[in-house]
Amino acid sequence: MSAAKPKVAKKARVAPAHPPSSQMVVAAVTALKERGGSSTQAIKKYIAANYTVDMTKQGPFIRRALVKGVASGALVQTKGKGASGSFKLGKKKEGKSDAQKARIAAKKAKLAAKKKEQREKKALKTKARKEKVAAKKAAKKATKKTKKVKKPAAKKAKKPAAKKPAAKKPAAKKAKKPAKKVAKPAKKAAAKPAKKAAKPAKKAAKPAKKAAKPAKK
């Protein structure tokens, strides 16, 4: 087995001898209180006098802190450009009061409600338009269906109407034929007995002629 390696004691982190460069720059400008702004040289002197720093090494960090301070609004550059010139503290943005916050919140809520109302109205209009179009389409379909249904109904109604008058003709013929048949036997029955009654009368006359012959002798 290999021997356990001895644990190396971690070096205690050395606390920095000075705060960050941005804090030192702001502290210097605040303490100097120059009306026209504090120069870069004056700020460096204040930091060197009040903090334990190596100005040779810290110089670039101070210049960077000045540029960043102007960009963020913590500092205002009154003269010069970049890290050179004069600097003073920027105006602190005052926190909005509760009344202002309430007004802003109410304004936002009102705008949101208005937008919502507009969206709802728009949605209702589009819905109504769609319903109207759908109703028109449905009405057109209904009219087409009714037209299709009406055509067969008209044909069916016409055919039975034409057949009904034809049914009346057989009824009229049946009534006339029996009347003719009844009339013919009546004529024959009346005529035949009359002829038969006349024949015996002729036969009765013949004997009278025979009786006259003896008178000639």
From Swiss-Prot:
Gene Ontology MF annotations: double-stranded DNA binding; nucleosomal DNA binding; structural constituent of chromatin
Sequence ranges of Basic and acidic residues compositional bias: 114-123
A single GO BP: nucleosome assembly
InterPro entries named among the record's database cross-references: H1/H5 (IPR005819), Histone_H1/H5_H15 (IPR005818), WH-like_DNA-bd_sf (IPR036388), WH_DNA-bd_sf (IPR036390)
Cellular location(s): Nucleus; Chromosome
Compositionally biased intervals (Basic residues): 104-113, 124-217
Domain H15: from-to ranges: 17-91
Annotated TM spans: none
Gene3D superfamilies linked: Winged helix-like DNA-binding domain superfamily/Winged helix DNA-binding domain
UniProt keyword list: Chromosome, DNA-binding, Nucleus
Major localization listed first in the record, in broad terms: nucleus
Pfam families assigned: Linker_histone (PF00538)
Location of the region described as Disordered in the Swiss-Prot/TrEMBL record: 1-21, 80-217
One CC-aspect GO term: nucleus
Alphabetized SMART domains for the sequence: H15 (SM00526)
Family: Belongs to the histone H1/H5 family.
Protein's job: Histones H1 are necessary for the condensation of nucleosome chains into higher-order structures.
Protein's UniProt name: Histone H1-gamma, late
